[in-house]
């Protein structure tokens, strides 16, 4: 059943960690959870052009620390930091805590599954041939060091009368192997023929040590962890 489950949820606590990192009692939990949802909705809406892959929310004592992982940090920050100041104020309106906004640059967006899926979805909306978009994404990921990649596109592809699912894979993508560093992303293309779903799995090697923070270290450019190359 490894193919049915979300690869990120399956690996939480092994080589992935949660995007909301805080603890609250019963009285506060519901309110804070709703705040997280509203903050993420706001940021994804305001930063559509900033290639945002992840939003991590931490809540140290009486603070709300929001870390935005983006391939275009300049778009988030704006001229002389004007845009990020506006964002901070809007996030502060949602939560009663002091807000701290951090930006983390994604240096290789071609290896981030969420960004790859969104890129393909945008190309489908511009009527680029889906096979060409998939093949281009696969070649870019493999060229930059991915061990394997799989892309699924489903819906009325190319305006076909009957919806179908097409997929393309290169290398190996071991979904059952818990130590495998598998990134997963989903996006939806809103075309004139209806919606098309895009799913992307990217395998980046195996992590041999138990490290729930492995993903954060990878995005920060820390490749010091032991890793076994795929055979």
From Swiss-Prot:
GO terms of molecular function: mRNA binding; rRNA binding; structural constituent of ribosome
GO terms (BP aspect): translation
Domain KH type-2 span(s) in chain numbering: 39-107
Domain of life of the organism encoding this protein: Bacteria
Record keywords, A-Z: Ribonucleoprotein, Ribosomal protein, RNA-binding, rRNA-binding
Transmembrane segments: none
CDD domains according to UniProt: KH-II_30S_S3 (cd02412)
Entries under Pfam families matching the protein: KH_2 (PF07650), Ribosomal_S3_C (PF00189)
Family, as annotated: Belongs to the universal ribosomal protein uS3 family.
HAMAP family: Ribosomal_uS3_B (MF_01309_B)
Function, in words: Binds the lower part of the 30S subunit head. Binds mRNA in the 70S ribosome, positioning it for translation.
PANTHER family (UniProt xref): 30S/40S RIBOSOMAL PROTEIN S3, SMALL RIBOSOMAL SUBUNIT PROTEIN US3C
Protein name as annotated: Small ribosomal subunit protein uS3
Native species: Nitrobacter winogradskyi (strain ATCC 25391 / DSM 10237 / CIP 104748 / NCIMB 11846 / Nb-255)
